[in-house]
Amino acid sequence: MSSLSRELVFLILQFLDEEKFKETVHKLEQESGFFFNMKYFEDEVHNGNWDEVEKYLSGFTKVDDNRYSMKIFFEIRKQKYLEALDKHDRPKAVDILVKDLKVFSTFNEELFKEITQLLTLENFRENEQLSKYGDTKSARAIMLVELKKLIEANPLFRDKLQFPTLRNSRLRTLINQSLNWQHQLCKNPRPNPDIKTLFVDHSCGPPNGARAPSPVNNPLLGGIPKAGGFPPLGAHGPFQPTASPVPTPLAGWMSSPSSVPHPAVSAGAIALGGPSIPAALKHPRTPPTNASLDYPSADSEHVSKRTRPMGISDEVNLGVNMLPMSFSGQAHGHSPAFKAPDDLPKTVARTLSQGSSPMSMDFHPIKQTLLLVGTNVGDIGLWEVGSRERLVQKTFKVWDLSKCSMPLQAALVKEPVVSVNRVIWSPDGSLFGVAYSRHIVQLYSYHGGEDMRQHLEIDAHVGGVNDISFSTPNKQLCVITCGDDKTIKVWDAATGVKRHTFEGHEAPVYSVCPHYKENIQFIFSTALDGKIKAWLYDNMGSRVDYDAPGRWCTTMAYSADGTRLFSCGTSKDGESFIVEWNESEGAVKRTYQGFHKRSLGVVQFDTTKNRYLAAGDDFSIKFWDMDAVQLLTAIDGDGGLQASPRIRFNKEGSLLAVSGNENVIKIMANSDGLRLLHTFENISSESSKPAINSIAAAAAAAATSAGHADRSANVVSIQGMNGDSRNMVDVKPVITEESNDKSKIWKLTEVSEPSQCRSLRLPENLRVAKISRLIFTNSGNAILALASNAIHLLWKWQRNERNATGKATASLPPQQWQPASGILMTNDVAETNPEEAVPCFALSKNDSYVMSASGGKISLFNMMTFKTMATFMPPPPAATFLAFHPQDNNIIAIGMDDSTIQIYNVRVDEVKSKLKGHSKRITGLAFSNVLNVLVSSGADAQLCVWNTDGWEKQRSKVLPLPQGRPNSAPSDTRVQFHQDQAHFLVVHETQLAIYETTKLECMKQWAVRESLAPITHATFSCDSQLVYASFMDATVCVFSSANLRLRCRVNPSAYLPASLSNSNVHPLVIAAHPQEPNMFAVGLSDGGVHIFEPLESEGKWGVAPPAENGSASGAPTAPSVGASASDQPQR
């Protein structure tokens, strides 16, 4: 339906409301689906008119449209069911269960069973989750609060919750104006016209000899001037505009450049009176990291407008309590992908987990499987999609702040969060550029593999840098940028010297498109006011000035052969356009059809093979043949795409990168692309046969079974994460032979002398009894320890000539740090026995706060000032383990000594959920932000997996213990997730094990034999390649995580003085550096902290043991804990 027809419905709704046709108003709201009357909906819910509630909702959404819709219908039907139970109307309750609630059983069978069991209770409030259910009135009110949040968050209700601002009786006014026009056209207008009907046009009868008065004196006509006839408002179309002036040719200036700017002209027909910008949509409980953007006004600040979705953000980012239900990924209203031509990439071949939301992507111009990615938190990643390996990951950092302008320094202090707006390769792939949302452009040189180096950093624009591109005017490689300061700038790519500044836009410049034709180099630019301008490299001003369809965010691109020009734009009210331009005439040649009525974000597009156009819209990828305006096909990528996904073809068009929800990138492939990726798999399997990684295979199975197809397996094999298996394409047969020779002489690396490694005992200004907890800060420049006497110790490395990075190192001692006030961070101990207390802490992502407890209240400390910000949750029960939610620092999982886990919201000071599944105190908690689960472990040696959407327990398993050891013997069991977020490490005094999460299956296990000392603690290295484990006899062992085989042993004599060699001093805790995979630290039972690194000449801890019998593991997948010496490598 056209926008004017839609507005006509609003006028009719206003008219009906003013005339008190109340039932008809709501019927039209429902049938048109244009306006959801929240007040009416609330009234019907409060009155319990459930049939009318669902009937009204059906005009806007269906049960299975998306997660929000399903949750809305579920809550309504659940309330209806509970009210029937409350009235003891069992037949009605059964009827509701069978007819209304049964549909949800396919999505959550356990929940449906639990609801069914309520029938067996005399009072459903006996169910713990419903124990606080009050009376019907209050329950409806509580439910309504949740329903409103869900409706506001639901993309299907976008633009439907706000009635347009209209003057009273707007429809009557328009009719009167129409009658005025009709009367003005009468040949013999009467002074007091008699309007008898609206069904036909008005016309005055003969004057009977009377002279008609002037229209100016006619009170009906007022002061309206005489005008020609106007065509009527069509039922489904806009007014026809008057003809535009003949447009100036876009290409005319190319053959004979002129310094005189052409007059501004229209790019085509202008729709009369387009719909106004909707009111800003509210985002309920949106996490702080959410990259969503409300509809901005025309003069709003342009920060990351190019890439952030308008209105409601992707479903995964909304902080609404959802049912743990998944849906098929079929895009709304699109047919399946079977109609797509074979040469379109339509098969999901890879799914990569980037870690933050992709905002821009670009394939290498030569290496067809090398993908560059920029994200909403300023990260850049370089992926080899063939092997699913992330070669490089870099976070945003200003290289030299002293050279930055004061506005930039002030902007970074005020708002340190920086997004990537665009990443792009140079034509030969030797450089790539990154444009950020704050002033900065960074250029890197690329030398193959993971070798990228800093090249240039340019403080390019005041405000955001919205686009970046490369061009070669006069055969000199240049970088073109544009920004919020309304300028386009050209920089020398070798030196960073500014060559040109183009000024003339009156709004922030959104995109640039350099090109050349007939030996003339030029640049197209688009701005947020919809203006398209063209520039020569001569500083003589813009050569053309056109209006882009949509008149807001527009990008331009040529076909691969440079002969056809296209643009893609999205207007402020969400209407999107892809058009082809006639360059010779400067006019739109064709407009492609098939966009959603209101795009849910700024649409991105790309071209391929000189034949196809593609755009990300409506949770899908839409394709057009360049020569036909009709939509060719739409592909949903097996579901899970963003509302307006970012897309990018590789140069051959065989692969298409598409951004999805939950920070993933899907790689779509055609038959050529699949063959290309298959060659990587063959090469990888051949070059890595001695190191087959069973865990990587299990990761794939885990991801699939969890409904995250390929999401977890994509993070590369555990064997290859440290660079050992990278660039497998370049592996020569001689390397395999060399490896075989080494395997014959491999032996365990023993470190027994201080000279065999770099170790350092940290200086001690304050003596403590023993170190109970230990962690490196996330920045990697400090270590935080919690002692058994509830005091925190902090050591910081200083940046100086000997330590240019300021990072932790075993080569230089740090300073034990305290604020000038001299205060200590000391936990509340209440009346607890220090020996019985279980100390625990958790550090925030930005290292600013630490949450800590030592048997008493939980304390929140400021890490800069050591001040206590808050204390809460006095015992009993006492906290025994703390973990921050990975997506929201305000949510904390707290393990308690009464065996429960409390999900606590710091902001509102409220326990949201209490999880029960263990029988003894909680000793470990770990979140997976890929699988959306929490894994817990306890002193009962039990492992539990909890869904973080509804906090239901998914499965549990008791850790197998050695024969002869009773399960009742208390011992801490700790858990830590692998980098792939699909596997986790289990640490018990009797064993190390790696488990697959979704099935809770043990994939690898290393057991402590009876003659050996127990394990005290263990942790993954930062890249999950290694496992560091400490033992009661003071040895520290380093294992390869791929197979849990021992590769290096650090004996006590290497770091403990001789005076302590016969004592009982040993490591209680061990911590890995967050960026250096071969650095770790231990906290000792005598209160000391030691940091370890291998010798610089070695660079790593020993050599991975060779494969046995063609396997990466010399042990069975899950040997018994009591395995004999022949089953286990010696320690």
Swiss-Prot record:
Expression by tissue: Expressed in embryo and in extraembryonic tissues. Expressed in inflorescences, flowers, floral meristems, developing anthers and ovules. Detected in the vascular tissues, shoot apical meristem, cotyledons and young leaves. Expressed ubiquitously in the pistils, stamens and pollens.
Example of a GO cellular component annotation carried by this entry: nucleus
WD repeats: 353-393, 415-454, 460-501, 504-545, 548-591, 595-634, 639-678, 710-756, 766-805, 833-871, 874-914, 917-956, 967-1005, 1010-1049, 1060-1102
Keyword ATP-binding found: no
UniProt domain CTLH: residue ranges: 34-92
GO MF annotation list: identical protein binding; protein homodimerization activity
LisH domain mapped to chain residues: 4-36
PROSITE patterns listed in its UniProt record: CTLH (PS50897), LISH (PS50896), WD_REPEATS_1 (PS00678), WD_REPEATS_2 (PS50082), WD_REPEATS_REGION (PS50294)
Other information: The tpl-1 gain-of-function allele is suppressed by mutations in the histone acetyltransferase HAG1 gene. The tpl-1 gain-of-function allele suppresses developmental defects in IAA12/BDL mutants.
Primary role: Transcriptional corepressor. May repress the expression of root-promoting genes in the top half of the embryo to allow proper differentiation of the shoot pole during the transition stage of embryogenesis. Regulates the expression of PLT1 and PLT2. Negative regulator of jasmonate responses. Negative regulator of auxin responses. Negative regulator of multiple floral organ identity genes. Required for ovule development.
Protein name: Protein TOPLESS
Organism, as annotated: Arabidopsis thaliana
